Amino acid sequence: MTEQEPASKPIVFTTHARQRMRERGAREDDVREAIRIGQRETAHRGLVLYRLNVEFNREWDGRYYGVQQVAPVVAEEKDRFVVVTVYTFYFQEGEKA
């Protein structure tokens, strides 16, 4: 039996992850995309961190940013991905065009 490719595994979100997404301004579609095509890094306790920079071009927390980095921390199970938490980072601070 072969291990499923990332594109075919379902992605589930813990309550904690959904709360952090709301607090940190991450959209579910961007988190899913980060897991599918983002840069993969080993994290603590057997978890995996994915990173994906997405075009943002709007305000967050009173400042305007061009790029948002979405970084979900994931438990990769045999048949699914479980999003444990989500970090976000903002870049290219500037002014609205």
Per-segment meaning from a language model:
Residues 1-97:
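Ribonuclease/tRNase effector modules and their secretory precursors
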